[in-house]
Design a protein with these regions (language model features):
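A contiguous active-site-proximal alpha/beta segment in oxidoreductase catalytic domains
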Residues: 1-48
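A structural signal for well-ordered alpha-helical scaffolds and beta->alpha junctions
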Residues: 5, 9, 68-75, 112, ...
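Short aromatic-enriched loop/helix-cap "lid" or pocket-rim segments at secondary-structure transitions
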Residues: 8-10, 36-42, 103-105, 140-141, ...
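Phosphate/oxyanion-binding loops and surfaces in catalytic or ligand/nucleic-acid-binding neighborhoods
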Residues: 15, 33, 78-82, 218-224, ...
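Rossmann-like dinucleotide-binding domain that binds NAD(P)(H)
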Residues: 48-137, 209-216
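C-terminal helix-rich "cap/oligomerization" subdomain common to oxidoreductases
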Residues: 94-96, 188-229
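NAD(P)-dinucleotide binding in Rossmann-like oxidoreductases
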Residues: 106-114, 118-190
């Protein structure tokens, strides 16, 4: 069980945070760019080409399961490698369709276009912001860590690279990590000379378990949001 976002742990690799207890709040984001149709309504864009997505998205192809898995994997791997536990809780604060209407109980067909999830990972308060219709420019695709000492760490995807920032008042340190997320995941976890299988074979099953737990939790949120199905 894999998710390419689980390789986005430069915060850990660059030792920007000492341990998980240094974090007071985490925000996770995946806010995708969108277009507009002839009726002036927001439409999804193809991830690879940027062209309008011709598919009609239906549940379960909404943001909670489709892209929530990416953000949750990134947050949990970051917390885990900072010494945190695998404990997590989440609830749906809001879930809306493509046109901004709340998903109703009993609706088993409409896909969520936007959702706000809230909970804790290893005891740290977490908010996850998912949006498939975030406008022409989209929004942040990564995380934001608020540290106990007042510093902020921002992790984003910009074009063909990841951008990591350490923000202290008006001072910003910035690192650029080129390459696709798939490349980093394959090299760091699967096929590379220092893959997870080589570095820590026992961690493979634990990593798999975390990915399965995340999908199970998001499926549970759908049951709570829509009713048993």
């Amino acid at each position: 069980a894999l998710d390419h976002w689980m390789a986005r742990i430069e915060t850990v690799k660059r030792s920007l945070v000492g341990c998980v207890s240094d974090i007071v709040k985490i925000d996770g984001f995946l806010q995708e760019p969108s277009g507009v149709n002839a009726a002036g309504e927001p439409i999804a864009l193809n991830f690879a080409t940027g062209e309008p997505d011709a598919r009609t998205l239906r549940h379960p192809d909404g943001v909670i399961l489709d892209i929530g898995t990416h953000v949750l994997a990134m947050l949990r791997e970051t917390v885990r490698y900072l010494g945190g536990s695998d404990d997590m809780t989440l609830q749906v604060v809001t879930a809306k369709d493509r046109l901004g209407r709340a998903i109703a109980k009993g609706d088993m067909s409409t896909a969520e276009g936007e959702a706000h999830l809230q909970g804790r990972i290893s005891g740290v308060p977490v908010n996850i912001w998912l949006n498939k219709y975030a406008g022409p420019a989209g929004g942040q695709k990564g995380l934001r860590l608020c540290l106990r000492d007042g510093r902020i760490i921002s992790y984003d995807r910009r074009g063909a690279e990841d951008v990591l920032e350490l923000i202290e008042g008006k001072d910003i340190q910035r690192w650029h990590i080129p390459g696709t997320l798939y490349e980093h995941c394959l090299a760091g976890h699967i096929l590379g000379t220092s893959s997870l299988f080589e570095r820590d074979p026992h961690e493979v099953s634990r990593t798999t378990r975390r990915r399965i737990e995340e999908v199970e939790l998001l499926l549970t949120l759908q049951q709570q949001l829509r009713g048993p199905h």
